[in-house]
Protein backbone atom coordinates (compact mmCIF):
# COMPACT_ATOMS: atom_id res chain seq x y z
CA UNK A 1 0.00 0.00 0.00
CA UNK A 2 2.50 2.63 -1.16
CA UNK A 3 -0.42 4.95 -1.92
CA UNK A 4 -1.11 5.11 1.83
CA UNK A 5 0.06 8.36 3.42
CA UNK A 6 -0.72 10.16 6.65
CA UNK A 7 -4.46 9.52 6.68
CA UNK A 8 -6.72 6.72 7.97
CA UNK A 9 -8.46 5.80 4.72
CA UNK A 10 -8.34 2.49 2.90
CA UNK A 11 -6.30 3.00 -0.27
CA UNK A 12 -4.79 -0.16 -1.69
CA UNK A 13 -1.83 -0.81 -3.99
CA UNK A 14 -2.16 -2.19 -7.50
CA UNK A 15 -2.79 -5.92 -7.18
CA UNK A 16 -2.92 -8.80 -9.67
CA UNK A 17 -5.27 -10.86 -7.49
CA UNK A 18 -8.65 -9.52 -8.73
CA UNK A 19 -7.58 -10.38 -12.30
CA UNK A 20 -6.23 -13.84 -11.43
CA UNK A 21 -9.31 -14.46 -9.27
CA UNK A 22 -11.59 -13.66 -12.22
CA UNK A 23 -9.55 -15.95 -14.47
CA UNK A 24 -9.71 -18.71 -11.84
CA UNK A 25 -13.49 -18.34 -11.45
CA UNK A 26 -14.07 -18.40 -15.22
CA UNK A 27 -11.80 -21.44 -15.63
CA UNK A 28 -13.49 -23.27 -12.74
CA UNK A 29 -17.02 -22.71 -14.07
CA UNK A 30 -16.01 -23.61 -17.64
CA UNK A 31 -14.29 -26.75 -16.37
CA UNK A 32 -17.36 -27.68 -14.33
CA UNK A 33 -19.59 -27.41 -17.41
CA UNK A 34 -17.16 -29.63 -19.36
CA UNK A 35 -17.03 -32.13 -16.51
CA UNK A 36 -20.84 -32.28 -16.26
CA UNK A 37 -20.97 -33.08 -19.98
CA UNK A 38 -18.76 -36.15 -19.56
CA UNK A 39 -15.48 -34.49 -20.61
CA UNK A 40 -12.31 -34.70 -18.53
CA UNK A 41 -11.94 -32.86 -15.22
CA UNK A 42 -8.57 -31.21 -15.95
CA UNK A 43 -9.90 -27.69 -16.67
CA UNK A 44 -11.99 -27.77 -13.47
CA UNK A 45 -8.94 -28.80 -11.43
CA UNK A 46 -6.82 -26.06 -13.06
CA UNK A 47 -9.46 -23.45 -12.23
CA UNK A 48 -9.58 -24.58 -8.60
CA UNK A 49 -5.78 -24.42 -8.33
CA UNK A 50 -5.74 -20.85 -9.74
CA UNK A 51 -8.55 -19.79 -7.39
CA UNK A 52 -6.96 -21.34 -4.28
CA UNK A 53 -3.56 -19.78 -5.03
CA UNK A 54 -5.21 -16.40 -5.63
CA UNK A 55 -7.22 -16.53 -2.40
CA UNK A 56 -4.15 -17.60 -0.42
CA UNK A 57 -1.95 -14.80 -1.75
CA UNK A 58 -4.67 -12.14 -1.56
CA UNK A 59 -5.47 -12.90 2.08
CA UNK A 60 -1.73 -13.14 2.80
CA UNK A 61 -1.36 -9.57 1.54
CA UNK A 62 -4.31 -8.37 3.66
CA UNK A 63 -2.78 -10.04 6.74
CA UNK A 64 0.57 -8.37 6.05
CA UNK A 65 -1.08 -4.97 5.69
CA UNK A 66 -2.90 -5.31 9.00
CA UNK A 67 -0.26 -7.14 11.05
CA UNK A 68 3.11 -5.83 9.89
CA UNK A 69 2.41 -2.55 8.09
CA UNK A 70 -0.16 -1.18 10.53
CA UNK A 71 -2.45 -0.03 7.73
CA UNK A 72 -5.70 -1.29 9.27
CA UNK A 73 -6.62 1.89 11.12
CA UNK A 74 -9.92 2.37 12.94
CA UNK A 75 -11.56 3.78 9.79
CA UNK A 76 -10.28 0.87 7.68
CA UNK A 77 -11.48 -1.68 10.25
CA UNK A 78 -14.96 -0.12 10.27
CA UNK A 79 -15.04 -0.49 6.49
CA UNK A 80 -13.95 -4.12 6.73
CA UNK A 81 -16.66 -4.79 9.34
CA UNK A 82 -19.34 -3.35 7.07
CA UNK A 83 -17.94 -5.37 4.18
CA UNK A 84 -18.22 -8.60 6.18
CA UNK A 85 -21.73 -7.74 7.40
CA UNK A 86 -22.91 -7.07 3.84
CA UNK A 87 -21.21 -10.25 2.61
CA UNK A 88 -23.04 -12.34 5.23
CA UNK A 89 -26.30 -10.57 4.32
CA UNK A 90 -25.77 -11.54 0.68
CA UNK A 91 -25.20 -15.13 1.81
CA UNK A 92 -28.46 -15.02 3.80
CA UNK A 93 -30.34 -14.01 0.64
CA UNK A 94 -28.50 -16.76 -1.23
CA UNK A 95 -29.92 -19.38 1.15
CA UNK A 96 -33.36 -17.73 1.10
CA UNK A 97 -33.63 -18.82 -2.55
CA UNK A 98 -33.08 -22.47 -1.57
CA UNK A 99 -35.64 -22.32 1.23
CA UNK A 100 -38.06 -20.59 -1.15
CA UNK A 101 -37.68 -23.41 -3.69
CA UNK A 102 -38.17 -25.99 -0.94
CA UNK A 103 -41.34 -24.44 0.51
CA UNK A 104 -42.74 -23.65 -2.93
CA UNK A 105 -42.63 -27.37 -3.74
CA UNK A 106 -43.42 -28.85 -0.33
CA UNK A 107 -46.38 -26.73 0.80
CA UNK A 108 -48.36 -27.57 -2.33
CA UNK A 109 -46.89 -30.74 -3.88
CA UNK A 110 -47.59 -31.23 -7.58
CA UNK A 111 -49.70 -34.16 -8.78
CA UNK A 112 -46.56 -35.57 -10.48
CA UNK A 113 -45.07 -36.02 -7.00
CA UNK A 114 -48.08 -37.99 -5.83
CA UNK A 115 -49.54 -34.86 -4.19
CA UNK A 116 -47.48 -35.71 -1.10
CA UNK A 117 -44.26 -34.57 0.55
CA UNK A 118 -41.79 -36.22 0.52
CA UNK A 119 -42.77 -37.38 -2.98
CA UNK A 120 -43.90 -40.95 -3.58
CA UNK A 121 -40.95 -43.36 -3.58
CA UNK A 122 -38.58 -41.07 -1.67
CA UNK A 123 -37.18 -42.46 1.59
CA UNK A 124 -36.11 -39.44 3.64
CA UNK A 125 -33.48 -39.35 6.40
CA UNK A 126 -34.37 -39.97 10.02
CA UNK A 127 -33.87 -36.50 11.57
CA UNK A 128 -32.93 -38.03 14.92
CA UNK A 129 -29.86 -39.88 13.68
CA UNK A 130 -26.91 -38.25 11.83
CA UNK A 131 -28.73 -34.91 11.27
CA UNK A 132 -29.33 -34.52 15.01
CA UNK A 133 -25.70 -35.41 15.76
CA UNK A 134 -24.56 -32.83 13.20
CA UNK A 135 -26.79 -30.25 14.89
CA UNK A 136 -25.18 -30.98 18.25
CA UNK A 137 -21.71 -30.75 16.66
CA UNK A 138 -22.35 -27.33 15.12
CA UNK A 139 -23.96 -25.99 18.31
CA UNK A 140 -20.92 -27.21 20.27
CA UNK A 141 -18.62 -25.53 17.75
CA UNK A 142 -20.51 -22.28 18.27
CA UNK A 143 -19.75 -22.57 21.99
CA UNK A 144 -16.04 -23.30 21.42
CA UNK A 145 -15.55 -20.39 18.99
CA UNK A 146 -17.23 -18.04 21.50
CA UNK A 147 -14.96 -19.46 24.22
CA UNK A 148 -11.95 -18.73 21.99
CA UNK A 149 -13.15 -15.17 21.35
CA UNK A 150 -13.68 -14.40 25.05
CA UNK A 151 -10.29 -15.93 25.86
CA UNK A 152 -8.65 -13.71 23.25
CA UNK A 153 -10.34 -10.65 24.75
CA UNK A 154 -8.81 -11.64 28.10
CA UNK A 155 -5.32 -12.20 26.61
CA UNK A 156 -5.51 -15.92 27.45
CA UNK A 157 -3.34 -17.34 24.66
CA UNK A 158 -3.63 -21.03 25.55
CA UNK A 159 -7.42 -21.09 25.92
CA UNK A 160 -7.84 -19.19 22.65
CA UNK A 161 -5.69 -21.85 20.98
CA UNK A 162 -7.76 -24.64 22.53
CA UNK A 163 -11.07 -23.04 21.56
CA UNK A 164 -10.00 -22.55 17.95
CA UNK A 165 -8.52 -26.06 17.75
CA UNK A 166 -11.73 -27.70 18.98
CA UNK A 167 -13.85 -25.55 16.65
CA UNK A 168 -11.79 -26.62 13.62
CA UNK A 169 -11.96 -30.25 14.79
CA UNK A 170 -15.75 -30.10 15.13
CA UNK A 171 -16.03 -28.51 11.67
CA UNK A 172 -14.01 -31.37 10.16
CA UNK A 173 -16.12 -33.93 12.07
CA UNK A 174 -19.32 -32.35 10.72
CA UNK A 175 -17.98 -32.51 7.15
CA UNK A 176 -17.03 -36.19 7.51
CA UNK A 177 -20.50 -37.08 8.81
CA UNK A 178 -22.16 -35.08 6.04
CA UNK A 179 -20.06 -36.89 3.42
CA UNK A 180 -21.04 -40.25 4.98
CA UNK A 181 -24.70 -39.22 4.89
CA UNK A 182 -24.43 -38.34 1.19
CA UNK A 183 -22.74 -41.67 0.40
CA UNK A 184 -25.49 -43.61 2.22
CA UNK A 185 -28.37 -41.45 0.92
CA UNK A 186 -31.29 -43.52 -0.48
CA UNK A 187 -32.00 -40.84 -3.12
CA UNK A 188 -29.95 -38.62 -5.46
CA UNK A 189 -30.05 -35.03 -6.70
CA UNK A 190 -31.92 -36.36 -9.77
CA UNK A 191 -34.80 -37.81 -7.70
CA UNK A 192 -37.49 -35.16 -8.17
CA UNK A 193 -37.56 -31.67 -6.68
CA UNK A 194 -37.02 -33.20 -3.23
CA UNK A 195 -33.57 -34.51 -4.15
CA UNK A 196 -32.71 -31.28 -5.96
CA UNK A 197 -33.62 -28.94 -3.09
CA UNK A 198 -32.13 -31.26 -0.45
CA UNK A 199 -28.72 -31.60 -2.08
CA UNK A 200 -28.56 -27.98 -3.23
CA UNK A 201 -29.36 -26.57 0.22
CA UNK A 202 -27.33 -29.01 2.34
CA UNK A 203 -24.52 -29.17 -0.24
CA UNK A 204 -24.02 -25.42 -0.38
CA UNK A 205 -24.18 -25.32 3.40
CA UNK A 206 -21.50 -28.02 3.47
CA UNK A 207 -19.31 -25.88 1.19
CA UNK A 208 -19.79 -22.98 3.61
CA UNK A 209 -18.76 -25.22 6.51
CA UNK A 210 -15.56 -26.12 4.62
CA UNK A 211 -14.87 -22.42 3.94
CA UNK A 212 -15.56 -21.53 7.58
CA UNK A 213 -13.34 -24.35 8.84
CA UNK A 214 -10.52 -23.13 6.58
CA UNK A 215 -11.09 -19.56 7.78
CA UNK A 216 -10.84 -20.66 11.43
CA UNK A 217 -7.78 -22.84 10.71
CA UNK A 218 -6.03 -19.78 9.24
CA UNK A 219 -7.03 -17.83 12.37
CA UNK A 220 -5.55 -20.60 14.54
CA UNK A 221 -2.25 -20.47 12.63
CA UNK A 222 -2.19 -16.66 12.80
CA UNK A 223 -2.93 -16.78 16.52
CA UNK A 224 -0.03 -19.20 17.06
CA UNK A 225 2.15 -16.63 15.25
CA UNK A 226 0.89 -13.85 17.56
CA UNK A 227 -0.97 -11.92 14.86
CA UNK A 228 -3.91 -11.11 17.17
CA UNK A 229 -4.22 -8.94 20.25
CA UNK A 230 -7.23 -8.25 22.45
CA UNK A 231 -7.68 -4.88 20.72
CA UNK A 232 -6.89 -5.82 17.13
CA UNK A 233 -8.28 -9.12 15.86
CA UNK A 234 -10.86 -8.40 13.19
CA UNK A 235 -9.75 -11.42 11.13
CA UNK A 236 -10.82 -13.65 14.00
CA UNK A 237 -14.07 -11.73 14.55
CA UNK A 238 -14.99 -12.08 10.87
CA UNK A 239 -14.37 -15.85 11.05
CA UNK A 240 -16.52 -16.09 14.21
CA UNK A 241 -19.37 -14.13 12.60
CA UNK A 242 -19.22 -16.37 9.55
CA UNK A 243 -19.23 -19.51 11.71
CA UNK A 244 -22.27 -18.35 13.70
CA UNK A 245 -24.02 -17.65 10.39
CA UNK A 246 -23.25 -21.23 9.27
CA UNK A 247 -24.67 -22.50 12.59
CA UNK A 248 -27.93 -20.58 12.21
CA UNK A 249 -28.40 -21.70 8.60
CA UNK A 250 -27.96 -25.33 9.68
CA UNK A 251 -30.62 -24.94 12.38
CA UNK A 252 -33.09 -23.74 9.74
CA UNK A 253 -32.04 -26.59 7.42
CA UNK A 254 -32.50 -29.16 10.17
CA UNK A 255 -35.89 -27.87 11.30
CA UNK A 256 -37.35 -27.41 7.81
CA UNK A 257 -35.77 -29.96 5.46
CA UNK A 258 -34.82 -32.81 7.79
CA UNK A 259 -37.51 -32.63 10.47
CA UNK A 260 -40.60 -30.91 9.03
CA UNK A 261 -39.96 -31.77 5.38
CA UNK A 262 -38.94 -35.36 6.03
Curated annotation (Swiss-Prot):
GO molecular function ontology, one term from the record: cytochrome-c oxidase activity
InterPro entries recorded: Cyt_c/ubiquinol_Oxase_su3, Cyt_c_oxase_su3_dom, Cyt_c_oxidase-like_su3, Cyt_c_oxidase_su3-like_sf, Cyt_c_oxidase_su3_a-hlx
Presence of keyword rRNA-binding: no
Claim: Translocase is one of the keywords in the record: yes
Predominant place of localization: mitochondrion
Subcellular location: Mitochondrion inner membrane
CDD domains (alphabetical): Cyt_c_Oxidase_III
EC number annotated for this UniProt entry: 7.1.1.9
Membrane-traversing stretches: 39-59, 83-103, 120-140, 163-183, 198-218, 240-260
Keywords: Membrane, Mitochondrion, Mitochondrion inner membrane, Translocase, Transmembrane, Transmembrane helix
Substrates-to-products reaction catalysed: 4 Fe(II)-[cytochrome c] + O2 + 8 H(+)(in) = 4 Fe(III)-[cytochrome c] + 2 H2O + 4 H(+)(out)
GO biological process: one example: mitochondrial electron transport, cytochrome c to oxygen
GO CC terms, sorted: mitochondrial inner membrane; mitochondrion; respiratory chain complex IV
Membrane topology: Multi-pass membrane protein
Function noted in UniProt: Component of the cytochrome c oxidase, the last enzyme in the mitochondrial electron transport chain which drives oxidative phosphorylation. The respiratory chain contains 3 multisubunit complexes succinate dehydrogenase (complex II, CII), ubiquinol-cytochrome c oxidoreductase (cytochrome b-c1 complex, complex III, CIII) and cytochrome c oxidase (complex IV, CIV), that cooperate to transfer electrons derived from NADH and succinate to molecular oxygen, creating an electrochemical gradient over the inner membrane that drives transmembrane transport and the ATP synthase.
Family listed: Belongs to the cytochrome c oxidase subunit 3 family.
Oligomeric and partner information: Component of the cytochrome c oxidase (complex IV, CIV), a multisubunit enzyme composed of a catalytic core of 3 subunits and several supernumerary subunits. The complex exists as a monomer or a dimer and forms supercomplexes (SCs) in the inner mitochondrial membrane with ubiquinol-cytochrome c oxidoreductase (cytochrome b-c1 complex, complex III, CIII).
Name of the protein in its database record: Cytochrome c oxidase subunit 3
Amino acid sequence: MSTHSNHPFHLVDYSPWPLTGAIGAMTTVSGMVKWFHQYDISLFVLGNIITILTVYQWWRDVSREGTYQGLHTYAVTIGLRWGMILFILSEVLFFVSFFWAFFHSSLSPAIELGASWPPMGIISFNPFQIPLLNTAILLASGVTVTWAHHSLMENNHSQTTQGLFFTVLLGIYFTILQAYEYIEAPFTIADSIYGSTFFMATGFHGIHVLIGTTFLLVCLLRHLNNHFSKNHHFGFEAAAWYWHFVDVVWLFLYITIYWWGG
